[in-house]
A protein has these predicted regions:
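Short, glycine-/small- and polar/acidic-enriched structural segments
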Residues: 28-178, 183-188, 192-196, 215-216
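A bilobed periplasmic-binding-protein/Venus flytrap-type ligand-binding module shared by bacterial periplasmic
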Residues: 125-135, 225-242
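Extracytoplasmic/periplasmic substrate-binding proteins
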Residues: 202-219, 223-224
Length: 349
């Protein structure tokens, strides 16, 4: 699939691991930062609707962590008619939170993208089935109907990774493009399984009273990189201190949220006006509880350091399934130069 097709398709669905959808606060919505840009001004792009999964950015902004790191932030949610990297490449944003797999696909078109920091340390994808399903492993997907939003973006790549991890071929399963109706389709028995994200789809289904089980796509068998801090190599090289400040303050906020989750809810509420009743607050807290472990990873501490081996495996996998349209060098598409713990990282840019 050509990148232009992917960009159009992801207008409402890109980086689904971040619970994205049509923007609720208007195209290119901003709510913080200075009105005129200076050397320390940084515009941080977030896709589409405000959500507690973006809380590290909200907290770093509202608590002054970005300012303390030496930058003046402007937080910008994409408009519903924007592509995932459109504003970044146009210079309207300096960094964007987006999935590493989609950045790699875009980079294969020759776009100047680089991941300067890890946002999710743990891959959030999972195969979701009814609790009563006979599917208990990825191998059990043989002969089953798997529902996904469409054959593009993170959910699609995760589906192909799940099939491979189960020792299967795509010909062994039926992949149905069902749009963003996974919950209804699974509940109605229209599909046997859906591929979604443990901190979004699975949470929403449980909140809706649907009895489900998850088969995780663990990092050892899933060669994909989820949400990352993405910029252009040109900007990072021209503004190395600002790039480090973004990664440092964002990861500092992750650790602060782990210590006091309420700070995330309070900061998100300034953006998400729906957090005004017990039901919406309960949902946000459930999503947050499922998201904090993704930020922290196995070490229970966020530091922004990325794993070059995982990026290399991902590039090889994406190439094997035919979604890369040119060469992608893992050492170019990701860099640990800007992570606060870079001196301890085993992979270098």
């Amino acid at each position: 699939m050509k990148l232009s097709t992917i960009v159009r398709a992801t207008v409402i669905g890109a980086s689904a691991s971040l619970a994205l959808g049509a923007c609720a606060v208007g195209p290119g919505a901003t709510q913080s930062g200075a009105s005129s840009r200076g050397a320390s001004d940084v515009t941080i792009g977030l896709t589409y609707i405000p959500n507690v999964q973006f809380a590290p950015v909200y907290v770093a902004d509202s608590e002054g962590l970005y300012n303390d790191a030496g930058i003046t932030p402007t937080v910008r949610h994409h408009g519903s008619d924007e592509g995932l990297f459109t504003a970044l490449l146009a210079g309207q944003e300096d960094v964007v939170i987006a999935s590493g797999d989609e950045a790699a696909v875009a980079a294969s078109q020759g776009l100047d993208l680089v991941s300067i920091g890890q946002y999710y340390a743990t891959y959030p994808g999972s195969v979701i089935v009814p609790a009563s399903s006979s599917i208990t492993s990825l191998a059990d997907l043989a002969g089953k109907n798997i529902g996904i939003p469409g054959e593009y973006g993170s959910s699609y790549y995760a589906t192909l990774a799940a099939i491979k991890a189960g020792g299967l071929q795509t010909s062994d399963v039926t992949i149905s493009s069902i749009g963003y109706t996974q919950q209804a389709a699974l509940a109605a028995g229209q599909v046997d399984a859906v591929v979604g994200f443990t901190n979004n789809d699975a949470v929403q289904m449980r909140l809706a009273g649907i009895d489900i089980r998850e088969i995780p796509l663990d990092g050892a068998s899933t060669p994909l990189v989820a949400a990352s801090i993405i910029t252009t190599r040109e900007w990072a090289q021209a503004h190395p201190d600002a790039a480090r400040a973004v990664v440092s303050a964002t990861t500092e906020a992750m650790n602060a949220i782990a210590a006091d989750p309420q700070v995330a809810i309070d900061a998100t509420a300034k953006w998400d006006t729906t957090l005004s009743d017990e039901t919406s607050l309960a949902a946000a807290n459930a999503v947050l509880a499922a998201t904090v472990p993704l930020w922290l990873g196995d070490d229970a501490h966020a530091d922004g350091v990325q794993d070059l081996a995982t990026w290399s495996s991902m590039v090889s996998f994406l190439n094997s399934i035919g979604v890369l349209e040119g060469d992608v060098d893992p050492t170019v598409i990701m860099s640990n130069e800007y992570a606060p713990a870079a001196e301890n990282a085993s992979s270098q840019s």
